[in-house]
Amino acid sequence: GGYWEMFYRDWSLKPGGVYGGDRKTLDVHMHLMEAYTTLYEMTKSPSHQRKLIQQIEILLNKMVFRPYGTGIAQFDRYFKPLRAILFQNVWGADRPPEEDARPLDNTNYGHNIEMGWLLKHAIDILKEDLEPYKPAIQKLADHAYEWGVDWEYGGIYVEGPNEGPAIQVLKEFWQQAEALIGFLDAALIFQKQMYWEAFENIFDFVWNKMINHEVGEWLALLDRDGTVIWDHLAHEWKVSYHTVRATIQTIKRLKMLKDMVK
């Protein structure tokens, strides 16, 4: 089951290793869940519904650490977890290379919080009861809250172990964007102040450090304290997908929260 990571244009698999042809990833399966959610929303096709449910089952049953509920980045064809490597043509591949693959006990805070809100959206579109999925969503949000949020400088880190401080403390634009949506969703679902405080923390960091207000786009990569590392606003792997979506979805959820407290 599941999907391979990298293909050529003729749909033949790329080689393995850094070319990605021998791996399955959380990233691809999460975004296929997102794609099938929208496809099913538009068509109401039973086949699209079935595919969406399959994606949810793969993510929750094969691609998370037990008992933490956090995402595992990469797998072989049989869904055996692998130490994550950086593929040759993905976001961040033009940074200085790392000597080794990431530890197996490593998880990405941005992907976790993003998976939580995309899962909630998928369940809404399927019109299923959210209750059975709440523990999974809460584990993702709680782990990002405990280990991913930088309570000193603001923002959310890149990644770290399941138990312990972050090991990659830079601030990437897309993780900030997904955390805004994810923590607001958690605040709406669980009605806990802690999630609102996480949202405020990340929003303040984004507003004061990451946005180029002159043109409205976000900077790509900052150091932990907000010092600019990459000042470009566009890139092969940096488009307005995360930032525009986060702005729209944040406004939508803030309106929902406002209605709840009236």
Region annotations inferred by a language model:
Residues G1-K262:
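Glycan-recognition and catalytic cores of secretory/periplasmic carbohydrate-active enzymes
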